[in-house]
Structure formats: C-alpha cells, structure tokens
C-alpha cells in the first residue's frame, strides 16, 4: 500500500487525473457510474464517490433520536444517502418515522429502492436529487447531511491550500440555506465529515448547537474564501433550528 506522501506526489504528475478516471471505469458498477457522472457533473455535486457503512454515525443518530423522538408523524431526510446504508441504519433508531433518502447518483437510488423492496418498508422513500429545492418548507423534523459537503481529491497529504477548483463555499452555503428552509422550527440538522463549517454560514444564526464531539479524523477544512484553515479538535455535529 502506498504511503499518503507518495500518493500526494502521484496526484501532481501530468495525466494523473485522466489515468485515475480510466481506472475507475474498470472497477465496480458504483465506482464506474460515479466516474461517468464526472464527465458532465450535475448541479449540486460535491462528493462524487460514496463512502458509507452501516451505523456510521451512532453519536449523531442517538442524539437526534433523543431530541426529536419517534412517532408516525416524524419525517427524517437523509440528504446524500448514497447506497442507503444511512437510511437503513436510521430505521433502527426511528422504527415509526417516515424516512426519505435523496442522492444525486441515479445508480445509488436504484440500489436503495431495490433494498427497500427487499425489506418491504412502506414508510421509506428514495429519489434522485442534488438539492432539496423541491421539498416543502418546514416539512422535516430532522435532516442528516453526513459526509456530503466534501471531495475525496482534497483529502490528501498535504491538502490543497484552496478547494474552489473542486467545491465552493458559496455552493455549500446555498445548500445549507435550503436544508434550513425545509426543517420545522425546533428541527435538527446533523452534519459531519464536512470540509466546510456550518458555523461560517449566514444560516447558522437560525440554529443553536445540540451536540459536539471530538473530531473523528484529519478532514481538511476550508473557510468562506475557500482557503485551507486549521481543523479543530472538536466539532458541533447536531444543530437545532430556533423556534
């Protein structure tokens, strides 16, 4: 296995991105579909490749469950749900709630719907979307946006001093404003593994912190000007919308 330093040098070689793209085309179907999507990136694309697993964020899941409760009227959104592991994990915490998963990759949603069909869960829904602009205002009790606002090509050693060649704070701030719009007053926004800080957005004034934890790893962090800044030891990962 190559060291992070060697990988970083390889990324700087001429033709690396083309070679990397061609390699992804020969891999599994999910990786191939993500690579093809990069040929014409859709609006709202941040992280092209899914990186998900079952029960990946138990602290945030438990916190939202304790604060939001669980009832037949509870509505929860997983924004950037990838292949559905997050949504199916949330079902264990919210057995009565309606769960909605949105993802920008049609292949991911196809897999999600197949898994839903296998489980026969009538209160679980999936749709292809790169934003929440079609969702009704104040319609969700909780929104999860985990490992969404990032890009894998920034997670190198050392990280690039700027991020705007791949992702931009202005796009992030626009996405966050719409996530806030669809939350009910008192609703919860869970966001983790982001390369931007929620607290740097204008929308943050509408929220108060609900859960802070130790940072899980060395994730590069960028400011409003898309410049690399030091990563903190702790981060707030659940926010409550003020009533």
PLM feature spans:
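Class I SAM-dependent methyltransferase Rossmann-like catalytic core
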Residues: 32-71
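Conserved SAM-binding loop of SAM-dependent methyltransferases across substrates and taxa
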Residues: 83-95
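Conserved SAM-binding motif I beta-strand of class I
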Residues: 98-103
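Conserved SAM-binding loop
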Residues: 112-113
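Conserved SAM-binding strand-loop segment of SAM-dependent methyltransferases
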Residues: 119-131
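A short acidic, Gly/Pro-enriched loop at the edge of an enzyme's catalytic core
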Residues: 132-147
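Mobile active-site "lid"/loop adjacent to the S-adenosyl-L-methionine
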Residues: 145-175
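Conserved beta-strand signature within the Rossmann-like core of class I S-adenosyl-L-methionine
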Residues: 176, 186-193
